[in-house]
Amino acid sequence: MANLVLKTDFPDLKLVARGKVRDIYDLGEALLIVTTDRISAFDVIMNEGIPDKGYVLTQISAFWFRQMEDIIPNHIISTEVKDFPAECQKYAADLEGRSMLVKKANPLPAECIVRGYISGSGWKDYKATGSICGIKLPAGLVESDKLEEPIFTPSTKAELGTHDENISFDRMVEMMGKELAGKVRDVTIAIYKRARDIADAKGIIIADTKFEYGIYNGELIIIDECMTPDSSRFWPKDSYKPGGAQPSFDKQFLRDYLETLDWNKTAPAPPLPAEIVKKTGEKYMEALVRLTGKGK
């Protein structure tokens, strides 16, 4: 039975942030991150949720974090509710499968995007300038083409309801120093290349994705989520055909539907038909099953 959690309300716990998708509680020594079933598009949160979406995102993140531990440590302390502090246990039914107990890291002030294929805003940028985020690319590429090498295109972290802004690597160096910026870029590309190969063997193309990092006890760690359908473009390998947009296992399906409406992409969001909610949920669940071999 699909489970829908649009918002958490744990009176005994200290809520410190409610993002587009995640509710974050401060437990003193650690944070509790609960991934709800909220979904946003064009930086607007929809009124309807996608049942079990929070479960899918949490399980996919945990899967990837485990795969990358030798490249970079991550923020997870546990994803098992039984390991969480005593004050969380009464909320176990809402937490099961969709929550993480994590280390309190100091987040870096940039989102780290890596692109292996030309799509989305990257394709628009390339058509206009022949570059993506100032990185010159060969002439004659078509939409959804694979890039010869993945490119690193960081952005600022926007406040809720506003858009991220692409920045140059030089600007990132100014924000965090040359050594740290270089390490973040190298780690981002290394993670992407490994994930690309793992996903490829399971019939999924990861066209692009974004990571967030933090500093914990003086060490660089990966935080937030990791290569989920919310933070990545996942395409089915068996129908990949450069020269246009690709079908996907992510919220591109929802975005495409919204593009057909007479909506100005600002709140309030239009109502979503039950069929769009159902199909979006199926795409998320298929990504989990393909990657991990397990659904719910």
Swiss-Prot record:
Its EC number is 6.3.2.6. Gene3D superfamilies: ATP-grasp fold, B domain, Phosphorylase Kinase, domain 1. It catalyses: 5-amino-1-(5-phospho-D-ribosyl)imidazole-4-carboxylate + L-aspartate + ATP = (2S)-2-[5-amino-1-(5-phospho-beta-D-ribosyl)imidazole-4-carboxamido]succinate + ADP + phosphate + 2 H(+). GO terms for molecular function: ATP binding; phosphoribosylaminoimidazolesuccinocarboxamide synthase activity. CDD domains: SAICAR_synt_Sc. Pathway: Purine metabolism; IMP biosynthesis via de novo pathway; 5-amino-1-(5-phospho-D-ribosyl)imidazole-4-carboxamide from 5-amino-1-(5-phospho-D-ribosyl)imidazole-4-carboxylate: step 1/2. It comes from the Bacteria. Keywords: ATP-binding, Ligase, Nucleotide-binding, Purine biosynthesis. The keyword Acyltransferase does not apply. One of its GO terms (biological process) is 'de novo' IMP biosynthetic process. One of its GO terms (cellular component) is cytoplasm. Belongs to the SAICAR synthetase family. This is Phosphoribosylaminoimidazole-succinocarboxamide synthase. It comes from Geobacter metallireducens (strain ATCC 53774 / DSM 7210 / GS-15).
